[in-house]
Amino acid sequence: MRILFTILKDLGYPVSQEVQDYYSKIQFWNDWWKGYVQEFHKYQIKNESGNSREVKRKQMRMAKKICEDWADLLLNDKTRILVECNEHGTDITQEFLTGDKEDQNGGVLGNSKFWKLGNKAVEREFAQGTVCFYLQLVKPTVNKGQLSAQSVQIKAIKDAQKIVPLTYDEEDISEIALASEYTQNGERFMYIQVFKQEQEGYQIYNHYFKINNVAGDAVGYERVSAPNGEAISYKLPCKPFVILKPNIENNIADVPLGMSIYANAIDMLESCDLAYDNLFMDTLLGKKKIFMDQALLSMKPTAYALNDKGEKVPVKQEPDVGATLEKSLYVSTGTQVSPDKPRLFEEYNPSLRVDENKENVQFNLNLLSSKCGLGQNRYQFSIQNMTTATQVRASNKELTESVWKQRIAIQDALTELTRSIIILGKEKCHISGLDPDVRITIQFDDTMFSDEEAERLRMLQEISAGILQKWEYRVRYYGEDEETAREMTGETENPADRIQSRFFPQEGTQIEEGPEGEA
């Protein structure tokens, strides 16, 4: 990070010390996401000889699991972006964005593999606090000073340490620098894009640098030309980037970057790993042991070594318990196993404390899950636990409320990004019929909050009560169109037409009589 800050300062974009210091916290959160924090997971123990050796604490890696779950809840391939304007404009704009309205595997989003990219980006957002989506022109050309392109592509910077805010206020980051590194012919390079706001749009500056190792840890750099002849700068008519941050207030530092969803739950992450490590150690140390009299063990031949004075001294002898059995199974007790009972061996089977360890792990999982906004019962340390969507909805109100809260930020970002895509499509790709003023709707995946079995049963009950018709059931759950569904159920007449003909007949039409001659 130091080299990035140095380059930005030399380019005329100094970064405040407070913002620079914040990146150490991002690195700490990223270590937890990876599952290994050296100062916590590495420790030392002493063996029977009094010598210390380094060991590694066992990990549940719950930080990554939490971020994966948040990403699946907020942005996945069942999320849909829909636009609505005049009929012709809607079709053209929707096709440019997503290819079609249902699958949405085409257009700008499909060509950018956005649903896969977006899901991974949201996972990193909740781990590190910040990610950035930005727009890039596909096959740009300049003709008579005018920039045009074939299409638009969505890219992402998922490493928060490569996102540097330049101009910002309490609500938004308006100017930013994005960095990425690449290696060519064994040499290290850095590419920096600077997005500067102007009166009408944004000016984008591209900078390329070769990173040189000077001496020791010192790093230098030199400016190089663009590898593929990219433009040094160009202008776009809209804001070509959006910043995603978890929708929680930053209580760690007054900076424009976001904070990890588990930033205030580090103690809980440590407790989970401690509990799991204790379970592992109890299992490891709970093996059967046989304490044996020395007379039952064959000894290796006496070995000698020279001391500092050149004298031969015997080396400590170890019991030869055989290569096929684990050494820790047998423990030599010298000449007597027990002072009270003269015997040659004694078996010892320690308790594994399975129930206590499971309860300890579950308790810490509940604390962690609740602290990260997923509700207390999100994770069950048991393979025998199954919960229906109705039970989730009823027992985990905290999760439901947290999801709605986080979707606000996702919806705002996707709406802004979508509108910028449409503007670039119209202004730079020259696609006629695109309407930047469309109404944009983000449809999120709500399957986790719905219980299809219960909904089917309720719909059947409403059909029996006469509230709904049978064809409506086939349309919803069999995917048939209305005409086919009516034909399959024999309900070919539209109820509205039946009411019209019965109670409001046209002139010359006889009113249908009831069973007792009443109209």
Range-by-range predicted roles:
Residues 356-361, 450-454, 462-469:
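Short acidic alpha-helix initiation/capping motifs at coil-to-helix transition points
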Residues 1-173, 515-519:
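Extended, helix-rich architectural segments
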Residues 121, 135-136, 283-291, 378-383, ...:
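Short coil/turn segments at secondary-structure boundaries
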Residues 114-129, 134, 281, 353-450:
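C-terminal amphipathic alpha-helical
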Residues 458-519:
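Activation/maturation switch segments at domain boundaries
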Residues 230-394, 398, 447:
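Extended, charged amphipathic alpha-helical segments
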Residues 19, 144-151, 298-325, 387, ...:
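Charge-rich, acidic-biased intrinsically disordered regions
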Residues 127, 132-261:
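Extended, regular secondary-structure scaffolds
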